[in-house]
Each structure stands twice: as C-alpha cells, then as structure tokens.
C-alpha cells in the first residue's frame, strides 16, 4: 500500500466508446491496483454483450431487491454502472482496493477539460470481436430508469 501512495503517475484517460464493459473493467482494475489514476470518458457508449431483453429482465429483478429507505442502492446512471463494474473487480473491502477505487473517475461524454487530452483505448476489449448481439450501457441505463437530465 505504501508503494501506491508514494508513486505519482500521470492521469490516464480511457475512451470507453465501443469497448466491452467487463473486459474493459478488468483491465482498468488491474491498472488501478498498480497506482495509476484513470479517467473513463464516454461511459454511456461502452457495450454489454448478450441479448438485451435478457439483461434488462435480470437487472429489473435485481433492482426490485431493497428500496429507498434501506439498501442496497443500485446504480442507474451509465457512469455509476461502469464505476460499480470496476469496483466489483477490485478487492474493495481491503485498504488497497479502496485506495485504488478512489483513483477512478468516470464521466458521461467527454468533459471540456479533457477534450484536448490524448485518449487511450483497451485493445483486448473492442466490441468488433463480438459475434453475438450487444447493446450500449446508455441503452441499458435508460431501460432500468435513468433519466438523461439527472
């Protein structure tokens, strides 16, 4: 853990447009554990593989658990869905996982201050490789109740 705090690595900007969510999240989680600070942009354009109807049904059943007064609270915004997916691939209940999670920022679209920055992509997570159906995180979020004005 001391290694992560003493190192100051530059901020890496990752463009999630057209990347498979789970594969991207696992690669980013690994890099976060090495101490890198990562910013993910275009979170709503990442893709989820599988049949849209099945994934939406599973998500709505999962969302039925809990409520407003008591947890668990479920993410509906695309940036929250992506952030939570990365969190699931970190050892979040340990100090190194919490510290790594703090080094992650996720945005819908591209913020003005990051537009001129060089953006990376994850080569192993390209959606072009998929032979099955897929849909975007933005479509998924709209189906489970995200209002784009939020």
Predicted regions and their residues:
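Ribosome-associated RNA-binding proteins
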Residues: 1-150
């Amino acid at each position: 853990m001391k290694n992560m705090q003493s190192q100051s690595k530059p901020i890496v900007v990752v463009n999630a447009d057209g990347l498979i969510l789970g594969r991207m999240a696992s690669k980013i989680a690994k890099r976060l554990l090495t101490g890198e600070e990562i910013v993910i942009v275009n979170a709503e354009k990442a893709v989820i593989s599988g049949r849209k109807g099945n994934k939406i049904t599973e998500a709505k059943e999962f969302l039925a658990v809990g409520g407003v007064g008591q947890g668990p609270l479920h993410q509906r915004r695309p940036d929250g869905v992506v952030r939570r997916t990365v969190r699931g691939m970190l050892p979040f209940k340990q100090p190194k996982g919490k510290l790594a999670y703090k080094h992650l920022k996720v945005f819908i679209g591209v913020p003005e201050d990051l537009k001129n920055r060089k953006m990376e992509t994850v080569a192993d997570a390209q959606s072009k490789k998929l032979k099955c159906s897929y849909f975007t995180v933005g479509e998924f979020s709209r189906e489970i109740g995200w209002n784009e004005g939020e």
